[in-house]
């Protein structure tokens, strides 16, 4: 796994310079982007420089920096929010396509995650244990408020959701799959005869294949087939 570590607090670094550094590293598209809050350990060089750099740190482990001459306490808390959003919506790998389009639309990766963290705070969503589906619901609400309505983020979110696993519970914004129940049945019956899309399913009949794969209709009427045996999601 390619991991890029971006330390939060270096001498003379303010929030604007960190903003630029974040965007530069984000453009590299690492698999993991780790934001690290530097610590002031007892007996360390950083402890010796506390007065010079205006460091205020936690008095108990993990001894993280809370304020510097260049970063206020409020800005450190703000960066904590960005760190949390990066962990949930980037490092988890569960929202790759949706976030890619959002960042392209936003034009500034740091600003997007910063705004998303502010949204969590405004909506009272912090300090709550959210399951995976709830994270999709929250991101959809955020997009409804701030995103481009011309881009089908509903499709992107559903694609990201099903690409990972064949979920049984669907988010509230997802259409009812019974709307294309007949098309799904016909597709798998045809696939059982023609063996056109699902490679390696030769030993399975149409009903078994329907449980092992998923057919999703997009907003434009096209279909995407999710092949979980081979870990593929593609237009059918």
What would you call each of these model-derived segments?
Residues 2-4, 231-236:
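Residue-level detector of conserved catalytic or cofactor/ligand-binding positions
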Residues 1-114:
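A structural motif corresponding to the C-terminal lobe/cap of the Radical SAM core domain
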Residues 84-234:
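Radical SAM enzyme core and accessory elements
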